[in-house]
Structure formats: C-alpha cells, structure tokens
C-alpha cells in the first residue's frame, strides 16, 4: 500500500502539507485537485521520496518509508513518477535507449529489457514512432515516451503530474486510453491535474486539497457536486457535473454516456 499518516512538510518556516492522511491503495485511479499552491507537487515529491516530511510519514507496504539509498531504490521500482514536462526525464535521443536506461542501471538482462521496452511502447501506442529521434517528437509523443520509461520498471503505482497538459483533444483522448490500459493491468494511478473534467471522468476517488489540507475526499460525483467545497477550493465543477447541479440533468460520468442518455430521452419524447 501507498499512504500517508499525519504528513507535515515545511519549506523553511512555512507549512505546505498539514497533517495529511491519504490512502492510495483503495482505488485504482485517485485524483488530486486544488488551486495552485495547495501542495499537490510537494505531496508528489514526498510520495516518491524526493522530499522527507518533518513530521508524520509516507507509508509503503504499511511501514514508514525507508530513506536509505537501498530503501529509496526499492521504492522507486514500485512507485514511479512522470513529470508534467517530459523533457525533465528524457536523457537520450534514441527512444529505446531512453526507455531502457533505468533497467540497464539495475543490471536487468538485455533479453528482459528488450521484452519490457517493447511491451511499454505497445501500451502507450508508440510503436509507430519508436525509431524517430526524440527531438523530432511532439510534446504528446514525448509524454508517452516518459510514461513508457516508468512502465518498464513494472511499478505498482504511477504518479502522473498534469498528464493532459499541452495536449490537443486527440492527444487527451489517447492519454485517457493509456491510463485505462495501465489500470487494466492491475496498477494504481495517482493523477495531479488542473484538468477537472479529466479527473472527474477517469478517477475512482478524489482528494481536494486547500492550503495543504484535505478539504474533501470521496467519489468524484459526490465531491464535484458539492458546489460550496468547489468554490472554497478555488475550483470549477466539471461540465457534466454543472449540467446536473444547475440544470437538473442526469449525472453522467463521460461525455459518451451523457449524449447516449440524451438521445434516448429525445427518442422517447418523439415516440
């Protein structure tokens, strides 16, 4: 399990995370939302062991995180982070070499590396551009390479920071499909994003953060339907939730479901 217990973190004398109790093992996809400065990025860095809390703990497998070199190496093979800017974690001009970088550092046999790289590229739908130089790839393609680089570790938890930022509508749809495929393999995904519609559609549970504290937690439909909490957090409701709360239309999880239900209603009225 990956969780936090009374997690506090300060930058100098300024508390950024204030007593957070979170459990990411309960849901396949957990969304983290909040206004800028609420602590999402700092939380991600604590979960990955890049930062160490001054009080409380990050819990891995039910125990406080081991911050020794060996302990952090073990954690990062099971908890992988993909940053908002893929340039931060791409080091080679050759895609296969970049994705295989961490495995070669771990001494994984070449035959196993080849198999894992091939599987990761297939999962992120990158086989058709795997032989292109990385500098020639689009922003969205680089994001997929970065995700593939995390997937080859066979991590059980994947932390995605703004996975749809900078993507066009087609790229956003493709990213959602990739996340669903990752989850279908039995993995957990934690998404930090300002894309409220994404979080609503794909998450099974949502934490709303405000000034380093949990303002609300629960199922996406319940959380985002709470207008008062959304306003207090400085957030807007997903458009599907707005249609429900402001117009009384059925609460749907996806755009496809919404239009299907509207078509059924229109057909009934016409007949």
Swiss-Prot record:
InterPro entries (alphabetical): AAA+_ATPase, ABC_transporter-like_ATP-bd, ABC_transporter-like_CS, ABC_transpr_CbiO/EcfA_su, Co_trans_ATP-bd, ECF_ABC_transporter_ATP-bd, P-loop_NTPase
TM stretches of this protein: none
Record carries keyword Phosphoprotein: no
GO cellular component, one term: ATP-binding cassette (ABC) transporter complex
Keywords: ATP-binding, Cell inner membrane, Cell membrane, Cobalamin biosynthesis, Cobalt, Cobalt transport, Ion transport, Membrane, Nucleotide-binding, Translocase, Transport
Ranges of residues in domain ABC transporter: 2-236
GO MF terms, alphabetically ordered: ATP binding; ATP hydrolysis activity; ATPase-coupled transmembrane transporter activity
Gene Ontology process terms (BP): cobalamin biosynthetic process; cobalt ion transport
Matching PANTHER family: ENERGY-COUPLING FACTOR TRANSPORTER ATP-BINDING PROTEIN ECFA1, HEAVY METAL TRANSPORTER
Family indicated by similarity: Belongs to the ABC transporter superfamily. Cobalt importer (TC 3.A.1.18.1) family.
Stated name of the protein: Cobalt import ATP-binding protein CbiO
Organism of derivation: Salmonella paratyphi A (strain ATCC 9150 / SARB42)
Taxonomic lineage: Bacteria, Pseudomonadati, Pseudomonadota, Gammaproteobacteria, Enterobacterales
């Amino acid at each position: 399990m990956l969780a936090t217990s009374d997690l506090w973190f300060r930058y100098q004398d300024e508390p950024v995370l204030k007593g957070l109790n979170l459990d990411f093992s309960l849901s396949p996809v957990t969304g983290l939302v909040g206004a800028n400065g609420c602590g999402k990025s700092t939380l991600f860095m604590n979960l990955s062991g890049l930062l160490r809390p001054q009080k409380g703990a990050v819990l891995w497998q039910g125990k406080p995180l081991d911050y020794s070199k060996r302990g952090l190496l073990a954690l990062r093979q099971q908890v992988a982070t993909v940053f908002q800017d893929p340039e931060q974690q791409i080091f080679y001009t050759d895609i296969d070499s970049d994705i295989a970088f961490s495995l070669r550092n771990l001494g994984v046999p070449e035959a196993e590396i080849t198999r894992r790289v091939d599987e990761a590229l297939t999962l992120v739908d990158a086989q058709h551009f795997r032989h292109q130089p990385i500098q020639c790839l689009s922003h969205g393609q680089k994001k997929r390479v970065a995700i593939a680089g995390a997937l080859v570790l066979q991590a059980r938890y994947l932390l995605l920071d703004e996975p749809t930022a900078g993507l066009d509508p087609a790229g956003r749809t493709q990213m959602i499909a990739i996340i669903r495929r990752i989850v279908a393999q039995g993995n957990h995904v934690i998404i930090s994003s300002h894309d409220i519609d994404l979080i609503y559609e794909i998450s099974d549970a949502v934490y709303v953060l405000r000034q380093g504290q949990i303002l609300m937690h629960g199922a996406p439909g319940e959380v985002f339907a709470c207008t008062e909490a959304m306003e207090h957090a400085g957030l807007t409701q997903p458009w599907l939730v707005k249609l429900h709360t402001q117009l009384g239309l059925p609460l749907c999880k996806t755009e496809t479901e919404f239009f299907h239900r509207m078509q059924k209603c229109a057909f009934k009225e016409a007949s």
